[in-house]
């Protein structure tokens, strides 16, 4: 597939990073552990003991606190921790016009780690009508974050458009609606482009597309799954990159966009493994974003060699600090790994973050609130010592 021209133009910009433009030297992916009072409020709401307005008050209070804490530890950007969501992606996808939530038991998802494993058939999204944007998804949530953050730049995370397609592929798209997948991709990209435009109009200047598919495609088992549901395991990542670029084409120059790519993060379990080598050349050269949040917290993620494809004018945020357990990494170990990565790409193009969010789903990972904040403080302190600024 020929190189995408918009991506080439984007990466051909000056290699000097504009002051104040994300991603930052010390950054984080987005989700944060839900406080116990919020989890209780959600349980009460689910059984009718709490009204929607009361739940919103609890959410608002929790978000004010996590924004305060992000600013206190020294981060230059702040998210709402995704505290209003059940999961990082489906809360968004189900709000797209043309999407319906279905229980498809034929598509199973497996997560595991060294201690446990979990397999189930979660509800999935099926396309049953032409895709449209019926309202600005997460618009109210972003506006609250915008008005709450004081010293930090408000950052919004949304699932990448590839997540609408990845799990079910062709089988999850009604052929009477989209007999031709080219029209599906055109409508999906246009829908996302409109969402991006509306978020910008609300004041969003830092937007992140979360995209596990681009990491999953490095795993031979995941490519096997893609083939089984009628996809193209060799080139599907290129199709995703092409359509993400269509959604971002012509975005305002002061809107920074990043993408985060991990291999699954559900209650400290993961779904895929493998380094970034399979997608790296197309990913780093063609995807028209400002920065890449990449997971590198353990051997599942492979080595740093794929960084040799990163062009000038883009940043890579090294996800070296794990969110899957509470043990605190050492600064010296982090600095050694940053030095290792800098063998393949200029140190000035690197940043530091956790490998993923702390709570991609409402249940959260196996660590405490104190451990979460300690890890974010460590990232800020380490970045300050390595680069001399944040």
Say what each PLM segment does:
Residues 2-390:
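Domain-level signal for soluble alpha/beta catalytic cores
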């Amino acid at each position: 597939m020929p190189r995408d021209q918009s991506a080439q133009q984007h990466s051909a910009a000056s290699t000097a990073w504009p002051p104040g433009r994300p991603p930052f030297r010390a950054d984080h992916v987005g989700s944060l552990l839900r406080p116990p009072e919020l989890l209780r409020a959600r349980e009460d709401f689910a059984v009718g003991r709490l009204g929607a307005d009361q739940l919103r008050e609890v959410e608002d209070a929790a978000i004010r606190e996590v924004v305060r804490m992000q600013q206190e530890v020294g981060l230059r950007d702040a998210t709402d921790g995704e505290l209003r969501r059940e999961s990082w992606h489906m809360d968004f996808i189900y709000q797209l016009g043309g999407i319906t939530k279905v229980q498809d038991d034929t598509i199973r998802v497996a997560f595991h780690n060294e201690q446990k494993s979990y397999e189930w058939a979660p509800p999935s999204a099926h396309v049953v009508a032409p895709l449209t944007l019926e309202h600005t998804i997460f618009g109210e949530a972003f506006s609250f974050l915008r008005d709450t953050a004081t010293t930090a730049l408000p950052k919004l995370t949304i699932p990448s458009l590839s997540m609408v397609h990845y799990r079910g592929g062709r089988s999850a798209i009604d052929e009477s609606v989209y007999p031709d997948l080219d029209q599906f991709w055109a409508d999906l990209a246009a829908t996302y482009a409109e969402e991006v435009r509306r978020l910008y109009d609300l004041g969003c200047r830092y937007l992140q597309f979360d995209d596990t598919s681009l990491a999953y495609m490095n795993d031979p088992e995941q490519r096997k799954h893609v083939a089984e549901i009628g996809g193209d395991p060799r080139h599907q990542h290129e199709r995703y990159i092409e359509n993400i670029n269509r959604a971002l084409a012509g975005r305002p120059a002061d809107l920074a966009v990043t993408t985060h790519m991990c291999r699954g993060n559900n209650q400290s379990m993961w779904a895929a493994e493998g380094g970034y080598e399979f997608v790296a050349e197309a990913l780093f050269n063609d995807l028209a974003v400002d920065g890449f949040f990449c997971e590198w917290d353990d051997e599942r993620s492979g080595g740093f060699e794929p960084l040799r494809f990163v062009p000038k004018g883009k940043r890579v945020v090294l996800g070296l600090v794990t969110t899957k357990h509470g043990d605190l990494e050492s600064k010296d170990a982090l600095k050694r790994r940053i030095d290792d990565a800098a063998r393949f790409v200029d140190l000035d193009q690197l940043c530091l973050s956790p490998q993923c969010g702390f709570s991609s789903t409402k249940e959260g990972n196996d660590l405490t609130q104190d451990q979460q904040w300690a890890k974010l403080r460590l990232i800020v302190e380490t970045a300050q010592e390595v680069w001399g600024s944040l």
